[in-house]
């Protein structure tokens, strides 16, 4: 203790010396000492020297200054230290030579002791021994505490003992016990590259009371300067508005202080007394000043202005901290009491992220620098010539001592603290913090409140504590609303876990903690050098959570922020671990350490246990609906790596009524690594059916959330309400999404990186580099560090969700519709990289009526397999997200979706379509305005083997549409969204009755087997169980556009100049190739099913007509005088012979005028007679000058079209559809597809044959066979004319016993198209033969002379051999090209629901435009030689581009908008048509389309009323070839049967244009057309018909040539006046016409002669026409390739292929040659002339002297040559599948030569072939003569061969002549070649 009388100057010098020896302050000189005395020392503006402070753990001191430092008192009286305006600037630094984790996580006690050691130890030389003695005396007492827990205590400097050391130590301890330190206005600035923080402390006080040291800290604030962040919300009335003035005042005062500091610094620099201990301090001081210069530009200290700036956000505020402890060297009884901590979450989130990212970045830089340095050292060390030094040994030893690998687990002297208490922790998710510590925002703020946090440190093994109250509060208008709270009642104790061996109660908190909301404890135990740490947290009270839109959004943003912080922390932690691992495995030279020098890290186990009570969450979706979730207790166990929840109950609360809608059972969250099977679609596909299978892979997941079952049930009303509220919730969510606490809005700095993805990428690249580095080192040291290996597993997913079973039931969909049950099994979703992928193994949706009725399947796997039998998921999902769009890929496989018409009927009664459409468009428009145009949503669907089931409403049939492969893209735009689909390989299947599905037991077993066997496609599966394929489509492209922003699109189109009509729903369908394969019964079922796929349309009388009127009507006002004419006059007028009398004229009236007569609506639906008398009139364009008829009604055809044209420019259509079909082929087959049809026919055949047998027995008994004198023929054709319409599908027996010729038939009419008849007394077995011949072209060659006849009735076998299945080849094919359908629905208003009637006179509902570019119908009947049945008249030349063969326009209007009924206006135009009608083809058409089955009859819907029907003029050119004559029809009055007596060739008809009015239904339309055109044809078209008669056709054409000889020159002369040229043209036309006709006539005669000769040769046993078959042409040697073929074409007792006159009388059926098709199908060709001249030849042949069986004469008149193919006679009906191939008859006029040269070549070829046949016959005759044993046999051989030797050369001559004449005639007029190719069937073998 110095005496008081010491002069002040000496005291200053002494104190200056002492302060300089502290090695803490720099540049302390006399000017810094304001007042110095032994009891009071005041220092001002003292700077702290960073060099003298030294290296701080983990950071470097950059700047330090104390504004004012005052020391009061002495050693005996206590010391008081007051420091004011202390400013410290530090920068974090991580040295690679130190353990980074220890530097980051160093303890507070260790850092405090090191700082004290730095301040009090004198490191200078022993210049002053007294000072050293005093310092050494004080050192042990101060540093013992700091060094007690250090692992490097041996490195501390040892002090020399002193005699006064004990006394001084006791004195110092007494002085320190009286020490009082007070620090005010402490500012600590932490600077780094990306983050600057300021820690402000208003006041810190240290004093000692009764041996207990008290530390009180007040006003702690943490402020961020960089990055620039959002401080949070602030209220307008908050005190922050007054802060600018205060900040200005404070800045002013700070500026004054800064000026003083600057002045003091200048005087200090210029002082002569200024001294330095070391020269290096000048450099460090200069460095310090240069570091501060950028901050001193504003004349302030570097840390003074930033904290006071209003733009600097405050991160947290602590009002006070009280710390109590005892002792100095050993601190005991440490208790920490913290008052209130307030945290602003908005600015602190990006700040923490920035800190973590900055640490990671600096660590990487240090790592790269160290690695580069190590590589450099290794290079020098590897060079042997370079001198080696041992100076590094000390560093290595130092490194080994200062870099411990193992943690120090030695027992400490005591716990770090005894008790920690924090009164309140308030975290605001939105509000900013004011400098006063209050939150700035008092409204719409969300606060997390932790009240009374207590933590007690019982011993080194146990820490426990709790949070008394934890709640989340929302502050709105100064009112607190509890978001989260815990129940204050007694919590259940059964949920408390028992994590350790000790009872939980023994280690629990005191009694007050038992009331805490949250309790926790941490237990540490060391067992066999393994450290066990158990942390247990218990939420023992029931929690209640109340959420609304704003709160949920704030919590969501807060959760995203916390997640981002966690990601950044993980990145930093992984970087630190990698760097520490690198340091631990390499020494200072960069070499890998030896294994012996590396300590083995002791293992540690961490156990975390979490247990909660039940939690109730209430979400307010709207004012009327809340969503409530009850979560059962949650259990989490880290060692078991899982969290479990027994159950979660979700319910809705509406009007106080709670309804359970969903239950989640057995929720498990596992962090254990698990492998699972996943499926993903392949990137590319090749052609084939099995290449679309997904790729199966095995993935692993470290985080899996699994649920055993999700069960939900809700009514449709509740679901609608829930979905509607969710939609409103989502839309308002988007509006509220830009909250202040969102991570995006919390940062103002645009360059700030919020995500840690880039850091992760950098870290991964660093790890890869380190791996490469260590691999290089391991080659030398044979050491590899596994922690540095980059295990980038591409098959490891970050998260997986798995649900084993999901059940969802929608109840009370409609009163009659029932419930819908949804079942999903094995639902799996996982996140791989940035994609979310998933699969649903099985999906099944059923409709359940709930009253015990059958369940209707809606969606299911098409084979109905169980889930465990399905190996491939039905649904695959892949969700991709990028900066531009979110894409969802959904793959659907093996689905069957059922369509039920009955459901539409039920829905139609409940749903208002207009309201739905309006709601949809309104919602879309509203939602589209919310969508951001920068990021769109795309949904892509892929379909593989999916099926659509079509179930009609009233029929038992069913159809399936199978989609082999397809894809669909759904794109959402700003004003519209698009659906683009492409479907490939579509198949249409149908079955007549679902009861006929043959799913046998074996099929069920096959369906239940695992799919490891061969994959079964839906087409194969359904055809195997009874369905038949009736059509297929190659490809369909579907585009749907839904326009939601109509007004915006209209404005855009106006700017672009587009005039296209708009529609709310625009549909476009483009399809490539289509094919239909139909029989008569399957076609009938298909048509009826299509009609039944729509709900039946029916109206009541009140809906159709106006029953009552408002005003009285005078019925006589609109009726003319001519109406009341005599009925007989009206009848005579309607049936007048003159065509003009059947027309009515149309007056010119106003286009906008229409007269509606009420009586018309009253009687239009009840009486067809009134329509016939009033409206069924005709207006033909040819009678333009016709006078007015008796009727005074006038019609304007352009009335509706003229008014409707203006609407398109202003009105938007609800729906517009465009359909384009490129190619469509329809194949019509004979036979029947349905088993029921075949069974009915077989039964009818059996009954007819039974009746015929009885009649035959009766005739035999009476011995009368007079009625068999004529040739009788059984028929299988259309019904007779006397069959009534009431017999549709009914078995009808037609007995004509009253015929004039006394000839009666036994027969039945089936399906209105099949007539079975057998003449009484004839052979009944011939009926089966005739049926087989008609259907399959099959003819059983039995010997007619066989006396034994097997009847079907007796044996019961032959009728089973009926060939009634579908024929192998089609009979007719229809080829349609470029079908275009444009449909526009102008209104969807239903007058029954929408009573808002538009103010218009009429209403146009829809319009349909149909165009077909080409229509070709091909004749493929085996008995016909013609090619095209119908086609365009190509002889007129090529038509214009864009013209269509058929155009039809249909417009439906509502004459009265108040009524539902509509009327149609039809306009049809057809191009000229060319017809080649063969009677067999015509009969097939009639039989095909007249087929009616009573099983598929439908009630008549609302009959269409045709208001106006227009038909353009039609030009026809007809060729007709009759085959048979129905004499019974002639006798019954069928006048049209006389047409079959004539052959027509080129008959021309011109049907005039007509207009019909008031037609009720299509049947009446056909009758009216016939009624109108028939008189015109009879009166004006007979000349064109008669000109086409075959015998007169050539004469007429030659006469036309003579006419051209005169008419053409006159016409040409009138045109140009050139006489010679006109005569030349006329002569040329005459010569061309006449020459062609003469040559054509010669060719016909030659061909006819050839036919007669071939038939004659065949009668005598020759080959006949079969010699021209392809088989005989190719088989030159006459060998039979297959021995079985010989048996096929021989019969009875004959052993050779040919029969002669003596052997059999059936000569026309024995010599058919077989052609083996190269593709494996047997085709039989027979060339025979069936043209115009054939009938003459047939008559000549009929009257020939050749002996023929009279019964076969009529069969030969049909000129059919058929083949026989043997079949196994099996009772099973499946033998019909192997039906016979049809004989292809080819005309002699086919393959005509185009010129003379080709004609001569074909003639020469024909002569050579026929002479070759003659040569073979001569050779055979020579062999037979040589082989004959007597003259009789030789004569017999000569008689048999002579006719053939004579006729065959004649056949060759006639054939050659016809070919030559055809070539010459076609060269004269080449236009006939086109008609020839269209008319005659083409044969490729001729070329």
From Swiss-Prot:
A family per Pfam: ATG2_CAD
Ranges of Polar residues composition bias in the record: 288-303, 487-498, 1281-1291
Location within or outside the cell: Preautophagosomal structure membrane; Endoplasmic reticulum membrane
Compositionally biased tracts (Low complexity): 141-162
Keywords, comma-separated and alphabetical: Autophagy, Endoplasmic reticulum, Lipid transport, Membrane, Protein transport, Transport
Region (Disordered): 125-164, 227-267, 288-310, 487-513, 1188-1209, 1260-1304, 1659-1696
GO MF annotations in UniProt: phosphatidylinositol-3-phosphate binding; protein-membrane adaptor activity
Domain of life where this protein originates: Eukaryota
Ranges of compositional bias, category Basic and acidic residues: 1188-1200
Membrane topology of this protein: Peripheral membrane protein
Main location: membrane
Extent of Acidic residues compositional bias: 253-265
GO biological process, one term: reticulophagy
GO (cellular component) term, any one: phagophore assembly site membrane
Catalytic reaction equation(s): a 1,2-diacyl-sn-glycero-3-phosphocholine(in) = a 1,2-diacyl-sn-glycero-3-phosphocholine(out); a 1,2-diacyl-sn-glycero-3-phospho-L-serine(in) = a 1,2-diacyl-sn-glycero-3-phospho-L-serine(out); a 1,2-diacyl-sn-glycero-3-phosphoethanolamine(in) = a 1,2-diacyl-sn-glycero-3-phosphoethanolamine(out)
Similarity comment text for this entry: Belongs to the ATG2 family.
Biological role: Lipid transfer protein required for autophagosome completion and peroxisome degradation. Tethers the edge of the isolation membrane (IM) to the endoplasmic reticulum (ER) and mediates direct lipid transfer from ER to IM for IM expansion. ATG2 binds to the ER exit site (ERES), which is the membrane source for autophagosome formation, using basic residues in its N-terminal region (NR) and to the expanding edge of the IM through its C-terminal region. The latter binding is assisted by an ATG18-PtdIns3P interaction.
Protein name in the entry: Autophagy-related protein 2
Organism: Debaryomyces hansenii (strain ATCC 36239 / CBS 767 / BCRC 21394 / JCM 1990 / NBRC 0083 / IGC 2968) (Yeast)
Lineage, top ranks: Eukaryota, Fungi, Dikarya, Ascomycota, Saccharomycotina
């Amino acid at each position: 203790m110095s005496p008081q009388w010491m002069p002040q100057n000496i005291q200053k010098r002494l104190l200056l010396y002492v302060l300089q020896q502290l090695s803490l302050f720099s540049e302390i000189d006399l000017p810094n000492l304001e007042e110095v005395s032994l009891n009071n020392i005041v220092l001002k503006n003292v700077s702290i020297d960073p060099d003298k402070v030294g290296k701080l753990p983990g950071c470097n001191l950059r700047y330090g200054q104390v504004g004012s430092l005052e020391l009061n008192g002495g050693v005996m009286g206590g010391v008081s230290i007051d420091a004011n305006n202390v400013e410290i600037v530090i920068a974090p630094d991580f040295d690679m030579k130190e353990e980074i984790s220890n530097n980051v996580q160093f303890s507070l006690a260790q850092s405090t002791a090191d700082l004290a050691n730095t301040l009090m130890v004198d490191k200078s030389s022993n210049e002053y021994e007294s000072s050293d003695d005093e310092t050494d005396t004080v050192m042990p007492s101060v540093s013992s505490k700091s060094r007690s827990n250090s692992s490097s205590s041996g490195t501390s400097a040892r002090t020399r003992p002193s005699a006064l050391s004990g006394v001084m130590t006791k004195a110092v301890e007494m002085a320190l016990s009286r020490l009082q330190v007070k620090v005010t206005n402490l500012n600590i600035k932490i600077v780094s590259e990306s983050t600057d923080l300021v820690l402000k402390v208003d006041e810190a006080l240290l004093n000692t009371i009764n041996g207990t040291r008290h530390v009180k800290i007040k006003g702690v604030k943490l402020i961020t300067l960089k990055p620039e962040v959002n401080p949070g919300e602030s209220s307008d009335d908050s005190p922050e508005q007054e802060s600018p003035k205060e900040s200005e005042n404070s800045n002013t005062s700070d500026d004054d202080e800064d000026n003083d500091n600057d002045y003091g610094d200048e005087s200090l620099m210029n002082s002569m007394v200024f001294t330095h201990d070391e020269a290096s301090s000048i450099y460090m001081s200069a460095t310090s000043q240069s570091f501060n210069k950028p901050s001193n530009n504003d004349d302030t200290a570097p840390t003074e202005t930033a904290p006071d700036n209003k733009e600097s956000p405050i991160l947290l505020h602590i009002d006070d901290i009280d710390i109590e402890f005892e002792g100095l060297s050993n601190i005991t009884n440490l208790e920490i009491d913290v008052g209130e901590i307030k945290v602003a979450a908005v600015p602190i989130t990006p700040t923490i992220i920035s800190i973590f990212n900055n640490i990671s970045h600096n660590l990487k830089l240090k790592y790269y620098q160290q690695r580069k340095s190590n590589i450099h050292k290794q290079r020098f060390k590897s060079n042997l010539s370079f001198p080696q030094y041992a100076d590094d040994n000390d560093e290595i030893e130092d490194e080994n001592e200062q870099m411990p690998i193992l943690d120090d687990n030695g027992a400490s002297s005591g716990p770090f603290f005894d008790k920690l208490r924090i009164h309140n922790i308030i975290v605001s998710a939105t509000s900013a913090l004011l400098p006063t510590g209050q939150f700035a925002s008092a409204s719409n703020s969300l606060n997390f409140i932790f009240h009374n946090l207590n933590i007690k440190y019982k011993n080194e093994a146990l820490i426990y504590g709790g949070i008394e109250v934890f709640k989340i509060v929302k502050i709105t208008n100064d009112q607190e609303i509890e978001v989260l709270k815990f129940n204050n009642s007694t919590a259940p104790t059964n949920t408390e876990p028992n994590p350790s061996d000790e009872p939980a109660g023994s280690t629990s908190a005191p009694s007050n903690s038992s009331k805490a909301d949250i309790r926790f404890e941490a237990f540490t135990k060391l067992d066999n050098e393994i450290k066990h740490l158990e942390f247990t947290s218990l939420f023992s009270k029931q929690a209640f959570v109340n959420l609304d839109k704003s709160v949920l959004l704030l919590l969501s943003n807060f959760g995203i922020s916390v997640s981002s912080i966690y990601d950044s922390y993980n990145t930093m932690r992984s970087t630190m671990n990698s760097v520490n691992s690198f340091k631990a495995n390499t020494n200072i030279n960069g070499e890998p350490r030896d294994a012996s020098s590396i300590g083995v890290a002791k293992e540690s186990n961490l156990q975390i246990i979490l247990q909660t009570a039940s939690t109730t969450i209430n979400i307010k979706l709207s004012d009327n609906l809340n969503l409530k979730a009850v979560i059962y207790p949650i259990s989490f166990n880290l060692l078991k790596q899982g969290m479990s929840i027994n159950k979660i109950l979700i319910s809705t609360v509406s009007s106080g009524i709670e309804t359970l809608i969903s239950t989640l059972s057995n929720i498990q969250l596992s962090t254990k690594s698990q492998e699972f099977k996943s499926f993903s679609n392949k990137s590319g596909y090749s052609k084939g059916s099995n290449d679309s299978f997904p790729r199966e892979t095995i993935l692993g997941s470290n985080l899996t959330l699994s649920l055993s079952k999700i069960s939900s049930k809700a009514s449709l009303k509740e679901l609608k309400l829930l979905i509607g509220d969710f939609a409103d919730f989502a839309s308002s969510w988007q509006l509220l999404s830009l909250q202040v606490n969102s991570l995006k809005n919390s940062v103002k700095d645009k360059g700030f990186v919020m995500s840690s993805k880039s850091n992760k990428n950098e870290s991964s690249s660093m790890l890869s580099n380190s791996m490469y580095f260590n691999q290089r080192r391991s080659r030398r040291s044979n050491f590899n560090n596994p922690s540095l290996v980059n295990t980038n597993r591409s098959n490891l997913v970050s998260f997986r969700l798995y649900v084993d079973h999901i059940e969802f039931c929608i109840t009370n969909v409609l009163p009659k519709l029932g419930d819908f049950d949804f079942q999903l099994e094995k639902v799996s979703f996982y996140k791989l990289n940035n994609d979310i992928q998933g699969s649903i193994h099985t999906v099944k949706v059923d409709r359940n009526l709930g009253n015990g009725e059958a369940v209707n399947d809606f969606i299911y796997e098409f084979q109905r397999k169980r889930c465990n039998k399905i190996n491939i998921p039905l649904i695959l999902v892949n969700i991709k997200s990028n900066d531009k769009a979110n894409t969802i890929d959904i793959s659907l496989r093996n689905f069957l979706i059922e369509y039920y018409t009955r459901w539409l009927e039920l829905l139609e009664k409940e749903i208002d379509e207009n309201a739905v459409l309006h709601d949809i468009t309104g919602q879309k428009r509203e939602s589209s305005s919310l969508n951001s145009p920068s990021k769109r949503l795309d949904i892509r669907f892929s379909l593989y083997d999916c099926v659509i089931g079509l179930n009609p409403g009233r029929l038992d049939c069913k159809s399936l549409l199978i989609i082999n492969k397809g894809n669909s893209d759904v794109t959402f735009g700003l004003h519209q969204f698009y659906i683009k689909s492409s479907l490939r390989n579509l198949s249409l299947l149908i079955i007549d009755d679902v009861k006929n599905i043959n799913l046998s037991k074996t099929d069920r077993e096959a369906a239940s087997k695992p799919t490891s066997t061969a994959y079964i496609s839906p087409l194969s599966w359904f055809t195997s169980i009874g369905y038949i394929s009736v059509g297929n489509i190659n490809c369909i492209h579907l585009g749907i556009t839904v326009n939601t922003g109509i007004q915006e699109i209209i404005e855009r189109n106006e700017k672009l100049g587009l005039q296209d009509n708009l529609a709310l729903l625009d549909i476009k369908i483009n399809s490539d190739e289509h094919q239909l394969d139909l029989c008569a019964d399957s076609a009938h079922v298909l048509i009826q099913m299509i009609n039944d796929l729509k709900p039946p349309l029916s109206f009541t009388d009140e809906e159709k007509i106006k029953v009552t009127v408002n005003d009285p009507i005078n019925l006589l006002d609109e009726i003319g005088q001519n109406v009341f004419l005599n009925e007989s006059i009206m009848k005579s007028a309607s049936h007048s012979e003159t065509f003009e009398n059947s027309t009515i004229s149309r007056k010119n009236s106003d286009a906008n005028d229409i007269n509606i007569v009420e009586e018309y609506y009253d009687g239009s639906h009840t009486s067809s007679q009134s329509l016939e008398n009033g409206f069924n009139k005709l207006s033909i364009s040819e009678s333009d000058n016709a006078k007015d008829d008796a009727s005074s009604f006038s019609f304007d055809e352009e009335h509706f079209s003229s008014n409707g044209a203006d609407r398109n420019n202003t009105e938007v259509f609800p729906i517009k559809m465009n359909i384009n079909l490129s190619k469509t082929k329809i194949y019509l087959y004979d036979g029947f597809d349905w088993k029921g049809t075949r069974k009915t026919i077989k039964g009818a055949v059996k009954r007819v044959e039974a009746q015929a047998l009885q009649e035959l027995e009766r005739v035999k008994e009476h011995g009368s066979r007079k009625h068999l004198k004529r040739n009788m023929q059984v028929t299988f054709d259309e019904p007779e004319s006397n069959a009534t319409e009431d017999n549709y599908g009914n078995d009808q027996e037609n007995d004509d016993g009253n015929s004039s010729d006394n000839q009666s038939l036994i027969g039945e009419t089936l399906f209105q198209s099949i007539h079975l008849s057998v003449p009484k007394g004839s052979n009944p077995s011939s009926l089966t033969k005739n049926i087989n011949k008609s259907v399959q072209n099959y003819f059983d060659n039995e010997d007619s002379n066989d006396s034994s006849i097997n009847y079907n009735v007796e044996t019961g076998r032959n009728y089973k051999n009926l060939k009634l299945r579908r024929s192998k080849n089609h009979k007719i094919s229809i080829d349609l090209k470029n079908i275009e359908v444009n449909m526009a629905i102008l209104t969807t208003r239903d007058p029954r629901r929408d009573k808002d009637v538009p103010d218009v006179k009429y209403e146009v509902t829809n319009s349909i435009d149909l165009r077909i570019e080409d229509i070709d119908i091909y004749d493929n009947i085996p008995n016909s030689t013609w090619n095209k049945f119908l086609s365009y008249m190509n002889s007129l030349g090529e038509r214009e581009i864009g013209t269509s063969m058929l155009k039809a326009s249909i417009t439906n209007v509502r004459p009265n908008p108040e009524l539902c009924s509509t009327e149609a206006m039809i306009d049809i135009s057809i191009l000229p048509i060319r017809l080649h009608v063969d009677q067999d083809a015509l009969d097939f058409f009639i039989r095909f389309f007249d087929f009616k089955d009573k099983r598929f009859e439908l009630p008549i819907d609302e009959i269409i009323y045709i208001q106006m029907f227009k038909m353009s003029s039609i030009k026809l050119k007809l060729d007709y070839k009759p085959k048979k004559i129905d004499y019974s029809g002639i006798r019954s009055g069928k006048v049209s049967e006389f047409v079959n007596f004539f052959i027509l060739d080129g008959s021309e008809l011109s049907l005039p244009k007509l207009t019909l009015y008031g037609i009720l239904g299509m049947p009446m339309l056909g009758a009216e057309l016939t009624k109108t055109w028939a008189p015109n044809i009879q009166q004006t078209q007979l000349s064109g018909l008669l000109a086409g008669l075959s015998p007169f056709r050539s004469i007429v054409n030659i006469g036309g040539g003579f006419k051209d000889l005169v008419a053409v020159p006159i016409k040409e002369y009138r045109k140009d006046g050139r006489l010679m040229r006109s005569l030349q043209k006329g002569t040329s036309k005459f010569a061309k016409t006449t020459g062609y006709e003469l040559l054509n006539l010669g060719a016909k005669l030659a061909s006819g002669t050839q036919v007669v000769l071939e038939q004659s040769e065949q009668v005598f046993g020759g080959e006949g026409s079969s010699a021209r078959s392809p088989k005989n042409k190719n088989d030159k040697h006459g060998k039979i390739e297959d021995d079985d073929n010989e048996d096929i074409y021989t019969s009875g007792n004959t052993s050779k292929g040919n029969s002669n006159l003596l052997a059999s009388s059936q000569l026309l059926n024995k010599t058919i040659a077989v052609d083996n098709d190269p593709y494996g199908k047997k085709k039989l060709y027979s060339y025979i002339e069936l043209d115009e001249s054939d009938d003459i030849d047939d008559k000549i042949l009929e009257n020939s002297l050749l002996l023929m069986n009279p019964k076969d004469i009529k069969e030969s008149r049909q000129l059919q040559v058929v083949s026989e193919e043997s079949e196994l006679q099996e009772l099973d009906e499946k033998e019909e599948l192997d039906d016979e191939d049809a004989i292809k008859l080819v005309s002699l006029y086919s393959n005509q030569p185009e010129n003379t040269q080709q004609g001569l070549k074909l003639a020469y070829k024909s002569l050579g072939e026929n002479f070759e046949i003659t040569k073979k016959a001569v050779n055979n005759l020579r062999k037979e003569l040589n082989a004959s044993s007597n003259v009789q046999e030789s004569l017999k051989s000569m008689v048999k061969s002579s006719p053939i030797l004579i006729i065959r050369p004649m056949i060759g001559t006639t054939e050659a002549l016809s070919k030559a004449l055809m070539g010459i005639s076609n060269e004269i007029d080449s236009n006939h070649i086109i008609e020839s190719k269209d008319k005659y069937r083409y044969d490729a073998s001729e070329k």
